[in-house]
Amino acid sequence: MDDLFLVNEINRLKIERDACILAHNYQLPEVQDIADIVGDSLALSRAAAETTNKVIVFCGVKFMAESAKILSPDKTVLIPSKYAGCPLADSITKEQLEMEKKKHPEAEVICYVNSSAEVKAVSDVSCTSSNAVKVVQNSKSNKILFVPDENLAGYVAEQIPDKEIIPWAGHCITHARITVDDVIKAQEEHPEAEMLVHPEVSEEIRENADFVGSTSAIINYAKNSDSKEFIIGTEIGVLHKMKKDSPEKQFYLLSPRLVCENMKMTRLVDVYNSLMNMQYEVFVPENVRIKALGSLEKMISIE
């Protein structure tokens, strides 16, 4: 099956199934191109909550599809690649978080959306890299237990020094591949370029950046900047939209290792098979969903 056939069939099946295709900014270019909405975790969570379609095909990883099901329990939520997981989300379990909460009973628990439904269910509020700082600012507590990404926790702590941020020792394995040598090499090769990085990178990478933000923030910054060259310190998938938005600008990936294997598992044929066979449906136990719902609803209410 060639790509043109798959695209035509996906568009036909989308109408037949009354489906909406959501794709994360890290997805393959051809998958982004057939999606109804492409965005970061916050934008996609809001889209999942607001869509009127009966079926949501979530081109992303497991925790994203779970969040869509939590927010839209009456919808059929499909994930085209059932093996697309997230090591960061897997770095903390519900049981581990409950033990950590006992150590810090006065702390509010804020969990990054890159976490399981079970972890969200025992958290006070969720956040994304887009709104993590605002979520913490909105907290009435001066002590925050922030899970599971220690680098995002560190970034938030830098922005809000008057609050005590207690991080969990988890990290994104893709962003962790960036080294200071990568930064030195990229800046030597492209001295006129601005460096834009995701807050999931380590502190030593962030402190060398011109801008730190979520995938959508990075995309928008480059689009609106007067600069013509950019070094991009996040997953390679964002380059697709950046090049479409600003074909006259030059974009250089900070490291060739910035590829998330899990995000790249979803191919056009997987989206086609998902719609054709209504596979693989995502389920969240109702007792878990109800508890996690409050955490996610608070998240999407904060700009």
From Swiss-Prot:
[4Fe-4S] cluster binds at residues 86, 172, 260. GO terms for molecular function: 4 iron, 4 sulfur cluster binding; metal ion binding; quinolinate synthetase A activity. Its cofactor is [4Fe-4S] cluster. It comes from the Bacteria. Iminosuccinate binds at residues 24, 41, 112-114, 129, 198-200, 215. Its EC number is 2.5.1.72. InterPro entries: NadA (IPR003473), NadA_sf (IPR036094), Quinolinate_synth_type2 (IPR023066). Pfam families: NadA. Keywords: 4Fe-4S, Cytoplasm, Iron, Iron-sulfur, Metal-binding, Pyridine nucleotide biosynthesis, Transferase. It catalyses: iminosuccinate + dihydroxyacetone phosphate = quinolinate + phosphate + 2 H2O + H(+). GO terms for biological process: 'de novo' NAD biosynthetic process from L-aspartate. Pathway: Cofactor biosynthesis; NAD(+) biosynthesis; quinolinate from iminoaspartate: step 1/1. Its main location: cytoplasm. It is an enzyme of class 2 (transferase). Binds 1 [4Fe-4S] cluster per subunit. Belongs to the quinolinate synthase family. Type 2 subfamily. PANTHER family: QUINOLINATE SYNTHASE, CHLOROPLASTIC (PTHR30573:SF0), QUINOLINATE SYNTHETASE A (PTHR30573). Catalyzes the condensation of iminoaspartate with dihydroxyacetone phosphate to form quinolinate. This is Quinolinate synthase. It comes from Clostridium kluyveri (strain ATCC 8527 / DSM 555 / NBRC 12016 / NCIMB 10680 / K1). The lineage of its organism: Bacteria, Bacillati, Bacillota, Clostridia, Eubacteriales.
